[in-house]
């Protein structure tokens, strides 16, 4: 995947004559020590990130960690002290004000925690407001605003006013306003944190659905671990202005970089984080490839040689066909039938995206290890009772 947005050795130091801080940074002084000596506040320190096109990239951290400063550096709402911010390879820290306005008009948009809707304007006019300030013609901005409202399910409220909407609906208008310019990159600064938990979950689901359709590059700032795990392809953890770890949720959960990160993830229910594909074992043992010359007799010998009671049949293209057993193969042989006759009726098969929390009852009741398939019904692997229990037991080992 191509890199859409890249940050290289980025610093933001607040205060007069910020360059004074670098000699203390080089000596290894902490953020607090630098503030005490110089009166300068270190917002972001030597941050480097590479964000891929089409991913939802979550930046997390405690209050004061630098995450909100970071997101404002990405569109130059805040000027960097040192370092690069590259969009499609162009360093926006070095472009002119006119070029920056063009980038903000066409490439990058932002959704804030505050809805910031104009109470005297309709939903449609609020959605089109940014385009109006940018000088886009009335008809064009109306069409784009209506399309954005359709994307967030508010086209029927185009002529309503903000006070007629719920909190979740008002935040959808804020999202539509950003989507109206059809940006390549969407920055979201704790955009859902002011919402009630139920509405927040609804908005997270809405964002994931929109992403599946449009594949924008989204940088999402959050302090909510559940939110980050729910929507993020990758997560960056910030501490005292530094990026201390970047990875997928399960990479960070399995290998936290330090105690700060470990504390963030302590108590995480991994049954909600990991899915069937994460623990499925792809093994040739018990795997039967359906070919013209491979019938019940060959399959039976294979299972007996491998001391397996059950086998998993796949065909060309790794397509999953079904499950057979020693008994079903013997029955097919006794009637001189093909391997199709040995397939067990209605075997339990699970989708690769199924959370581990939903697997326990299914796997526990199954007579054999459960086959896992992807959305194209391709064979991913199997999950046995022992494998599932071992995976769930990792929660205690990693977070205890």
Curated annotation (Swiss-Prot):
Main location: membrane
PROSITE patterns: ABC_TRANSPORTER_1, ABC_TRANSPORTER_2, CBS
Domain of life per record: Bacteria
UniProt membrane topology term: Peripheral membrane protein
Residue intervals of the ABC transporter domain: 29-265
Binding annotation for ATP: 61-68
Record keywords, A-Z: Amino-acid transport, ATP-binding, CBS domain, Cell inner membrane, Cell membrane, Membrane, Nucleotide-binding, Repeat, Transport
One GO BP annotation of this record: amino acid transport
Protein induction: Induced in response to increased extracellular osmolarity, this is the first gene of the proU operon (proV-proW-proX). Osmoregulation requires curved DNA downstream of the transcription start site in this gene, which is repressed when bound by H-NS. H-NS may act indirectly to influence the local topology of the promoter.
Keyword Transport on entry: yes
Compartments it resides in: Cell inner membrane
Any GO MF annotation of the entry: ATP binding
Residues annotated as domain CBS: 280-341, 343-400
A cellular component annotation (GO) from this entry: plasma membrane
Function per UniProt: Part of the ProU ABC transporter complex involved in glycine betaine and proline betaine uptake. Probably responsible for energy coupling to the transport system.
Similarity annotation: Belongs to the ABC transporter superfamily.
Subunit structure: The complex is composed of two ATP-binding proteins (ProV), two transmembrane proteins (ProW) and a solute-binding protein (ProX).
The protein's name in its UniProt record: Glycine betaine/proline betaine transport system ATP-binding protein ProV
């Amino acid at each position: 995947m191509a890199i859409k947005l890249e940050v290289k050795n980025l610093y933001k130091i607040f205060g007069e004559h910020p360059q004074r801080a670098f000699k203390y940074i080089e000596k290894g002084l902490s953020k607090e020590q630098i503030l005490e000596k110089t009166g300068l506040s270190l917002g972001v320190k030597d941050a480097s990130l590479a964000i891929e096109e089409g991913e939802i990239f979550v930046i997390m951290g405690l209050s004061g960690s630098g995450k909100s400063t970071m997101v404002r550096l990405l569109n130059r709402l805040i000027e960097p002290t040192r370092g690069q911010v590259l969009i499609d390879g162009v360093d926006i820290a070095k472009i002119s004000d006119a070029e920056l306005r063009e980038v903000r008009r066409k490439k990058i948009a932002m959704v804030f925690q505050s809805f910031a809707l104009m109470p005297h304007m309709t939903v449609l006019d609020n959605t089109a407001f940014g385009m109006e300030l940018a000088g886009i013609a009335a008809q064009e901005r109306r069409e784009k605003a209506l399309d954005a409202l359709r994307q967030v399910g508010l086209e029927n409220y185009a002529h309503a006013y903000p006070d007629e909407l719920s909190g979740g609906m008002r935040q959808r208008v804020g999202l539509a306003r950003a989507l109206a310019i059809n940006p390549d990159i969407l920055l979201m600064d704790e955009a859902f944190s002011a919402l009630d938990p139920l509405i927040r979950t609804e908005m997270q689901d809405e964002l994931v659905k929109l992403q599946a359709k449009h594949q924008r590059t989204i940088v999402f700032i959050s302090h909510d671990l559940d939110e980050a795990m729910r929507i993020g392809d990758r997560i960056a953890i910030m501490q005292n202005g530094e990026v201390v770890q970047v990875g997928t949720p399960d990479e960070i959960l399995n290998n936290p970089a330090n105690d700060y990160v470990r504390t963030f993830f302590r108590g995480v229910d991994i049954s909600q984080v990991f899915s069937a594909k994460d623990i499925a074992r792809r093994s040739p043992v018990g795997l039967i490839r359906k070919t013209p010359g491979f019938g019940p007799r060959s399959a039976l010998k294979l299972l007996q040689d491998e001391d397996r009671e059950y086998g998993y049949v796949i065909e060309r293209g790794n397509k999953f066909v079904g499950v057979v057993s020693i008994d079903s193969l013997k029955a097919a042989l006794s009637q001189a039938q093909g391997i199709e006759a040995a397939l067990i009726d209605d075997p339990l098969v699970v989708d690769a995206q199924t959370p581990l929390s939903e697997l326990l009852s299914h796997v526990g009741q199954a007579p054999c290890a459960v086959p896992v398939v992807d959305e194209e019904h391709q064979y991913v692997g199997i999950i046995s009772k022992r494998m599932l229990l071992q995976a769930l037991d990792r929660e205690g080992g990693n977070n205890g």
